[in-house]
Amino acid sequence: MSLKSERRGIHVDQSELLCKKGCGYYGNPAWQGFCSKCWREEYHKARQRQIQEDWELAERLQREEEEAFASSQSSQGAQSLTFSKFEEKKTNEKTRKVTTVKKFFSASSRAGSKKEIQEAKAPSPSINRQTSIETDRVTKEFIDFLKTFHKTGQEVYKQTKMFLEAMPYKRDLSIEEQSECTQDFYQNVAERMQTRGKVPPEKVEKIMDQIEKHIMTRLYKFVFCPETTDDEKKDLAIQKRIRALHWVTPQMLCVPVNEEIPEVSDMVVKAITDIIEMDSKRVPRDKLACITRCSKHIFNAIKITKNEPASADDFLPTLIYIVLKGNPPRLQSNIQYITRFCNPSRLMTGEDGYYFTNLCCAVAFIEKLDAQSLNLSQEDFDRYMSGQTSPRKQESESWPPEACLGVKQMYKNLDLLSQLNERQERIMNEAKKLEKDLIDWTDGIAKEVQDIVEKYPLEIKPPNQPLAAIDSENVENDKLPPPLQPQVYAG
């Protein structure tokens, strides 16, 4: 997969992300550019060719040995009887060895050896009882999920149980062969549900996700970064490579992200967190989910910076920058684990497959990164790699202090503190003003109440002259009109 470095940044033709056989699915560097389906076909063909070539070589060597032995027998007919008996004994031993090897590969021998392996490797009841809490939880969730599918769920559970019981006896196989067994299991279960169970595709996908979660939670510690592979060696190599490239700046990669914008800076931190969190997950689908979340944070950061949707040419350089800045633990082991044991349909299509393929491209670019990729001279690249100097140091010497990333962040924080101080002083002044207004308002209300009380007292004073009773003698009653004049009755 060719990676091009141009003035506007790193560019990868989107067609190069697809399977090189032209089937339309996403390819993978671990599969030599093929998709999962085409890679398995090519792998089987290559394996059959290798077996045929090995068989032909063995037959040719056997014929040459027999011819050489026959020739030596005819030329040494005059030798002593003792030597002839010695040769005869040697031939008998060789024949016996060949017979033993043939018996070993016979059906009865395979059955016997399998029985011995089962007796030797069958897990004891005590080991079965020592299951982790997470495994028990996942198993319970898996059973509860399958209950909703009735007969299909029972069949799926039966097949899954048989697969898990058979895997411990395959640990002597190479990790590629164990991966092939797992991929065959995925394919057989999915095909059986579609053909026999007539299960809709969307439900098949959900069931396959639960199957993957169930079996890989149980097999994780046996198949992730096994000792028989060089995964750990590759992890150390890529970590060392990333540490050596600590001097690479976003400008060299033409990363369209401005980390001075707070929202963008937050997105970058979240993207790094997600790519690092990938190592803590057990299920391939969960690891892919971390890659997908990381990629979406990258797209959001680019969108905020450019005020427009991000393109694929913007995404890949930024993903490379995130990987360099985060240096995720056991990166190669996680990529290999996903490649070997993830449901292949998830890697061949969809956003998960697209983002995973881009991550593989980013790692491949980092491994092959050179001076031309960064638009640098070979001399500068060598000096940066050797640690003699750093572009960040040169920038700090030639630029004003506020241009350095660390100093710039410090000034930014000081500016924020200054703004907070101004806001606090403004709030304090407003609070004091409010307090004074409340005091003035209280005094004003008290004065108004006092004035009203003085003007309209609450206590009613008795009148200076007594009030005239209606039946009392009043000289002024005569002045009233006749209807209103009081009448006096003698009691």
Curated annotation (Swiss-Prot):
Keywords for the protein's UniProt record, in alphabetical order = Acetylation, Coiled coil, Cytoplasm, Endocytosis, Endosome, Metal-binding, Phosphoprotein, Protein transport, Transport, Ubl conjugation, Ubl conjugation pathway, Zinc, Zinc-finger
* Segments for region (Interaction with ubiquitinated proteins): 1-74
The record places its A20-type zinc fingers at 13-47
Q: Does the keyword Ubl conjugation apply?
A: yes
Q: What post-translational modification information does the record give?
A: Monoubiquitinated.
The cellular component terms of Gene Ontology attached to this UniProt record, alphabetical and capped at eight, are: cytosol; dendrite; early endosome; nucleolus; presynaptic endosome; recycling endosome; vesicle
Annotated Zn(2+) binding sites: C19, C23, C35, C38
Q: Where is this region: Disordered?
A: 66-85, 462-491
Where does it localize? Cytoplasm; Early endosome; Recycling endosome
Q: Which residues carry this modification: N6-acetyllysine?
A: K151, K170
- Positions of post-translational Phosphoserine modification: S124, S132, S373, S377, S390
- What Gene Ontology biological process does one annotation of this record name? protein transport
Tissue pattern of expression reads: Expressed in the white matter tracts of the cerebellum, the fimbria hippocampi and the corpus callosum.
Any GO MF annotation of the entry: DNA binding
Ranges of residues in domain VPS9: 232-375
What SUPFAM superfamilies is this protein classified in?
Glucocorticoid receptor-like (DNA-binding domain), VPS9 domain
Task: Provide ranges: composition bias, Low complexity.
Answer: 69-84
Coiled-coil blocks: 407-448
The protein's assembly and partners: Heterodimer with RABEP1. The heterodimer binds RAB4A and RAB5A that have been activated by GTP-binding. Binds TSC2, GGA1, GGA2, GGA3, AP1G1 and AP1G2. Interacts with RAB21, and with 100-fold lower affinity also with RAB22. Interacts with ubiquitinated EGFR. Interacts with RGS14; the interaction is GTP-dependent.
Give a short account of what the protein does. Answer: Rab effector protein acting as linker between gamma-adaptin, RAB4A or RAB5A. Involved in endocytic membrane fusion and membrane trafficking of recycling endosomes. Stimulates nucleotide exchange on RAB5A. Can act as a ubiquitin ligase.
Q: What is this protein called?
A: Rab5 GDP/GTP exchange factor
